[in-house]
Regions:
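Short acidic, hydrophobic short linear motifs in intrinsically disordered regions
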Residues: 40-47, 149-150, 281-283
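Short, hydrophobic/amphipathic alpha-helical patches that form generic packing surfaces
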Residues: 24-32, 133-141, 272
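Extended mid-to-C-terminal alpha-helical interaction segments
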Residues: 199, 203-300
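DNA-contacting interfaces and partner/effector-binding or oligomerization modules
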Residues: 57, 61-81, 90-214
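Structural motif
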Residues: 15-24, 124-131, 261, 265
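Short, solvent-exposed alpha-helical "recognition" segments
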Residues: 302-317
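N-terminal low-complexity or simple alpha-helical regulatory segments
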Residues: 1-103
Length: 322
């Protein structure tokens, strides 16, 4: 599996709890993966297609959470790529299609399509968390990121120039130095800087892959600048990054099953601080806890969190405290 596919796999498993963020992410998937068409009989259909099963399953999950429906995923051969498959989801009920399009502000209450439809309605992107959710959806639908061991490149492919321009503006608002370029018939919004790409992965909540990206980036810098120290530095970086990635995975498992609020007293704060500061050292994490604790205290709490996560894996679900 490519680095980009691994990022998408992690992001596909991230379902925000806030309804407004779910709407923003769905809006992006609709823009980049769907075709809205009116039939001769006056019906409105929403046709979704993607080559990624994980992304398609997330699209269905968002529809289920927002509209309480479970549409079928249709698997078909991709005629453009041999030995590949595409995944389709078709909404053919006119009333449901209108409800979906109105929720994401593609249709007005009078069921009219707006001319020169923007990237997404300003109401949907009003909150910074929703802008990040929208960016996550856009990347899942039409984005890619190169393996940091080969190059530093992040891009989202748009079929229209105005969409690429607006997406570029959105990323700039989030503090990312995004650029746009034309590639044949496609408009590409892209980012080159390694630190900026790492920030993007963090914004989209690909925390584990962000740590792997940072790990690779730091290793590459060490190799290029201080060759004689590579072996020692690599071992330390790998140890720290792998430990942090494992902790993030444990916390996300708990968050998606029993919920962080059900952790024993003191562990819930530790879990939230680790999620918020995935690259922080044990000492730095200890300073962020109220009241502050030492490295041994942080290590003890993270170990307890790991034990709870392991019990969840063993039992195959959420567990009760104690």
């Amino acid at each position: 599996m490519s680095f980009s596919s691994e990022v998408k796999k992690e992001l596909a498993g991230q379902i925000g709890n806030a309804r407004h963020c779910q709407i923003a992410e769905l809006a992006a998937l609709l823009i980049f993966c769907c075709v809205v068409r009116a039939t001769d009989g006056g019906d409105i259909h929403i046709d979704y297609e993607s080559e990624h099963l994980d992304v398609t399953e997330k699209y269905v999950t968002l529809l289920k959470k927002l509209f309480h429906i479970s549409p079928e995923i249709i698997v078909k051969p991709d005629l453009r790529r041999r030995k590949k498959e595409v995944y389709q989801v078709n909404i053919t009920d006119r009333s449901l299609a209108i409800t979906i399009l109105q929720l994401v502000r593609f249709l007005s209450d009078s069921e009219d399509f707006a001319e020169d439809v923007p990237l997404a309605h300003q109401v949907i992107l009003n909150r910074s968390c929703c802008r990040r959710a929208f960016l996550r959806g856009a990347f899942l639908a039409a984005g890619s990121v190169s393996d940091p061991d080969k190059s530093y490149h992040f891009e989202i492919v748009c079929t229209e120039e105005n969409l690429a321009d607006q997406l570029c503006e959105l990323m700039v608002e989030l503090g990312i130095d995004a650029r746009r370029v034309q590639r044949q018939k496609y408009a590409i919004t892209y980012v080159k800087g390694s630190e900026q790409i790492a920030d993007l992965l963090g914004m989209m909540e690909a925390r584990v892959m962000m740590l792997q990206y940072e790990n690779s980036r730091i290793i590459n810098e060490v190799r290029g600048n201080i060759n004689r120290k590579v072996n020692c530095e690599t071992a330390n970086i790998n140890k720290t990054a792998n430990a942090a990635a494992r902790q993030i995975e444990d916390i996300e498992l708990i968050e998606n099953t029993m919920g962080l609020s059900k952790l024993p007293n003191g562990l819930d704060e530790m879990a939230r601080v680790r999620l918020q500061y995935p690259t922080a050292t044990l000492s730095e994490l200890g300073d962020l806890i109220n009241p502050p604790v030492g490295k041994s205290g942080v290590n003890h709490r993270l170990r307890k969190i790991g034990e709870i996560a392991e019990r969840i894996r063993t039992q195959g679900g959420s567990i009760r405290n104690g």
